[in-house]
């Protein structure tokens, strides 16, 4: 692909990303206001704690229409089985979408933690652009070649985001991990129970996770994200934020060695045994040591 053509395609990607986040926010909120989208559609592959409901289809339908409208050659991988989106011919790009992060909460009537996330990758599987929409607050997180940004649509503002520089696990850190499901919570506490007894009194455990969390890492809201058995479908749509921010996102082996996490097309239903995302290498290494030596 020639340079000018590449710029043109990247511009289309950026446009689709903003259109998607804007339209998905509006349509999901509209359906939520009517109490729609709670019909159960099925289970999620390798995710006994999760379920697919009607609201999950909204984002997928919007994105499919947009990529076809802009005549993009792309394949986008989604969380539910058989819901990948293909447009055009041989893909020039790949995508990963989490159409609605907060399904279980929405189904149970909680107006809390509703997000949608979307990332695009080049043919070499490198992140090009990522976006997260905070549906309830009408805020959009964007990661592109210019950096990471937060757009507050109600206030009409756009600010640049920067990560934390915390390096010491014994300090006043903010660690995110998904604790709402017992199967994940047990593994986290198995690794961190002893350390937690000596946590700094102002240490904060943010009990949420998923594809949106990487925008929080890029914004300095959290210092690290730790997950055991993390589904790739919860990483791919958002981890580009962390990479753009210079944060570390690694998959950890049983012996403590690790590799940079990489998007792999078609593997969204696989899991990572231990995923650590941290704002600094020093904090990453301390977390890995704690997990391996548990």
Regions found by a protein language model. Name each.
Residues 94-96, 130, 225:
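Short glycine-aspartate micro-motif
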Residues 113, 117-214, 266-294:
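Acidic beta-strand-loop-alpha-helix segment within the catalytic core
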Residues 50-51, 179, 200-201, 224-226:
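Short, contiguous strand/loop micro-motifs
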Residues 56, 60, 188-193, 238:
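Short, highly selective alpha-helical patches that border small-molecule cofactor pockets
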Residues 1-39, 71, 194-198, 206, ...:
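Oxyanion/phosphate-interacting regions
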Residues 41-126:
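Flexible, acidic active-site loops/lids enriched in D/E/S/T/G that coordinate Mg2+ and/or position polar
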């Amino acid at each position: 692909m020639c340079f000018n053509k590449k710029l043109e395609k990247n511009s289309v990607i950026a446009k689709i990303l903003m259109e998607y986040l804007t339209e998905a926010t509006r349509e999901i909120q509209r359906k939520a206001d009517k109490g729609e989208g709670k019909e159960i559609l099925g289970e999620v592959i390798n995710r006994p704690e999760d379920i697919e409901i009607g609201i999950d289809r909204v984002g997928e339908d919007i994105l499919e229409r947009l990529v076809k409208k802009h005549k993009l050659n792309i394949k986008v991988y989604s969380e539910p089985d058989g819901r990948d989106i293909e447009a055009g011919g041989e893909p020039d790009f790949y995508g990963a979408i989490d159409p609605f992060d907060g399904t279980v909460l929405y189904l149970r009537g909680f107006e809390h933690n509703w997000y949608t996330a979307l990332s695009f990758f080049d043919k070499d599987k490198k992140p090009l652009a990522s976006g997260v929409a905070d549906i309830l607050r009408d805020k959009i997180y964007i990661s592109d070649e210019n950096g990471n940004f937060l757009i507050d649509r109600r206030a009409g503002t756009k600010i640049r985001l920067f990560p934390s520089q915390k390096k010491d696990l014994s300090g006043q850190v903010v660690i995110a991990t998904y604790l709402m499901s017992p199967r994940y919570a047990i593994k986290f506490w198995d690794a961190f129970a002893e350390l937690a007894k000596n946590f700094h009194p102002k240490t904060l455990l943010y009990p949420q996770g998923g594809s949106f969390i990487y925008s929080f890492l890029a914004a300095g809201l959290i210092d690290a994200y730790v997950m055991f058995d993390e589904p790739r479908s919860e990483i791919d749509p958002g981890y580009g934020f962390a990479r753009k921010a210079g944060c570390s996102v690694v998959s950890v082996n049983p012996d403590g060695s690790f590799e940079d996490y990489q998007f792999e097309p078609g593997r969204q239903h696989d899991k990572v045994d231990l995923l650590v995302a941290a704002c600094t290498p020093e904090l990453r290494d301390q977390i890995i040591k704690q997990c391996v030596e548990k």
